[in-house]
Amino acid sequence: MATSAEAPAKEAQKRDSQPQKQKRETQDEAELLTVPDGWKEPAFSKEDNPRGLLEESSFATLFPKYREAYLKECWPLVQKALNEHHVKATLDLIEGSMTVCTTKKTFDPYIIIRARDLIKLLARSVSFEQAVRILQDDVACDIIKIGSLVRNKERFVKRRQRLIGPKGSTLKALELLTNCYVMVQGNTVSAIGPFSGLKEVRKVVLDTMKNIHPIYNIKTLMIKRELAKDSELRSQSWERFLPQFKHKNVNKRKEPKKKSVKKEYTPFPPPQPESQIDKELASGEYFLKASQKKRQKMEAIKAKQAEALTKRQEERNKAFIPPKEKPAVKPKEASTETKIDVAAIKEKVKKAKTKKLGALTAEEVKLKMEADEKKQKRKK
């Protein structure tokens, strides 16, 4: 029999053991949620489905005219790759279509979906070497339609070129960061790679079509890649490390030249305009007799006529008004104060007399004589 002193001690031990069990359970759950590095899902073999499939499944897709020559050349390789998984592939050059269908030997139920993706990628100008990777278990594909995202054709071409970058540098950087193969062709972007990479590629492509430059997303991907290497930061939030970009281009609305100032809102309707009878009542004309009204009208007409007559007379009289003459400017009298240097003028006249017209100056004569002497020396 247990004593009364031992009972509380056992209860205390139970209480201590409960949080330890909870911690272990949470640790086990965390270990289950995290996928260990280098782990691969076991491949689907014939032993998993020995009886095969019950019904035949098939998929077909059309391809453009310019892909006909390439598909005709690489079709034996496509058939060889699909025959390994017991899938039949046919190429119809007349109709311009590719078809894949399961056979009685097909054991993998999902291989037909991968074969469908293979022919879709081949139709979207992806090379056979890259498209055949879709048959692997850890590889997926995503065909992003970008044609309907931008209305203006010129703007669409510019944004698509921005995604490719100068000499394909932006696309190459995106491929290295996401471990995906990306192919931009026409109105679609085809991507092949792991699921995590495809998610990032789709985000970058859609953001580029929404006029967000891909360099911003590439920068965040580079930071995420470096943070993933740190084991401590793996389980933490990365928001504080990621850059926050501000939109610089603000849509400025064109303001009108004439701004109409809105009146203050009043719940009451505007006052009713005065009628002719109201005006007559206010002035007292309403109570006058017909003869008095007629007399007033005639007086108003005569006053108007008199005003018009005076105006007309003023306009006629304007023609007879002489224009204003400019004030006469008096000629300036020659000032007697200005002194003339007579001696300087005499010297100038003497020099002019001694000098012949077209004669050389003393300096010019010296230079000419020196030049003649040099010529004579050379001749000797």
Swiss-Prot record:
Compositional bias segments (type: Basic residues): 249-261
Composition skew (Basic and acidic residues), residue ranges: 8-27
InterPro entries in alphabetical order: KH_dom (IPR004087), KH_dom_type_1_sf (IPR036612), KRR1-like_KH1 (IPR041174), KRR1-like_KH1_euk (IPR048550), KRR1-like_KH2 (IPR048548), KRR1-like_KH2_euk (IPR048549), rRNA_assembly_KRR1 (IPR024166)
Covalent cross-link site, Glycyl lysine isopeptide (Lys-Gly) (interchain with G-Cter in SUMO2): 23, 339, 368
Annotated ranges, domain KH: 153-205
Job description of the protein: Part of the small subunit (SSU) processome, first precursor of the small eukaryotic ribosomal subunit. During the assembly of the SSU processome in the nucleolus, many ribosome biogenesis factors, an RNA chaperone and ribosomal proteins associate with the nascent pre-rRNA and work in concert to generate RNA folding, modifications, rearrangements and cleavage as well as targeted degradation of pre-ribosomal RNA by the RNA exosome.
The protein's name in its UniProt record: KRR1 small subunit processome component homolog
Modified sites of kind Phosphoserine: 4
Organism expressing this protein natively: Mus musculus (Mouse)
Keyword Ubl conjugation: yes
CDD domains the UniProt entry points to: KH-I_KRR1_rpt1, KH-I_KRR1_rpt2
GO MF assignments: RNA binding
Gene behind the chain: Krr1
Protein location: Nucleus, Nucleolus
